[in-house]
């Protein structure tokens, strides 16, 4: 799993914290933290959909699942970079890992999300250990978007995909979702 002598962290990827799938990811990350003794990093997306930051909601769930609070680090504690989507999250996680001497990431999410993250980080030099959880979000648009973003990420275009850039800019300006 993790190479001997490697410095590793658990990276919990999650954008929608109030779902059954998110709860399963939190439980998986908590089990891994107890088993491996590694810290958990949260680089949750900023979303106007939730009144509190996504990563803070996830931290609260992890602590409720028995993870020590000091074993969970939110992106605001690790970097000043903004994270609005998986592409930015991957860039920020890789930069933070390099700056902190981390060699390996144990990545927790559903398989589609993990494939995208792996594609985005394929040239980062980081060892990725994938810890997939079940895909519960089977909305047609979610699956379709992930299936489009995976090959774009493999081509190195994920962060420059025009619809994603426009969405990212719109999300950055919203204090709350339009009613």
How should these model regions be labeled?
Residues 1-145:
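A structural signal for short, hydrophobic/glycine-enriched beta-strand patches
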Residues 140-170:
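A transmembrane-helix-recognition feature enriched in membrane-embedded lipid enzymes
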Residues 168-179:
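Active-site cores that bind ATP or allylic diphosphates and position pyrophosphate for catalysis
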């Amino acid at each position: 799993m993790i190479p001997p002598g490697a410095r590793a962290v658990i990276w919990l990827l999650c954008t929608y914290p109030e779902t059954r799938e998110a709860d399963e990811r939190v439980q998986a990350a908590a089990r891994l933290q107890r088993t491996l003794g590694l810290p958990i990093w949260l680089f949750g997306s900023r979303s106007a959909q939730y009144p509190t930051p996504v990563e803070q909601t996830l931290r609260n769930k992890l602590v409720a699942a028995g993870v020590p609070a000091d074993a969970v680090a939110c992106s605001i504690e690790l970097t000043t970079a903004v994270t609005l989507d998986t592409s930015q999250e991957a860039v920020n996680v890789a930069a933070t890992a390099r700056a902190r001497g981390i060699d390996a990431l144990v990545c927790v999410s559903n398989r589609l999300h993990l494939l995208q993250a792996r594609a985005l980080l394929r040239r980062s030099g980081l060892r990725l250990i994938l810890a997939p959880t079940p895909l519960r979000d089977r909305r047609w648009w979610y699956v379709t978007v992930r299936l489009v973003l995976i090959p774009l990420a493999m081509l190195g275009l994920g962060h420059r995909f025009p619809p994603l850039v426009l969405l990212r800019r719109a999300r950055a300006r919203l204090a709350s979702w339009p009613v």
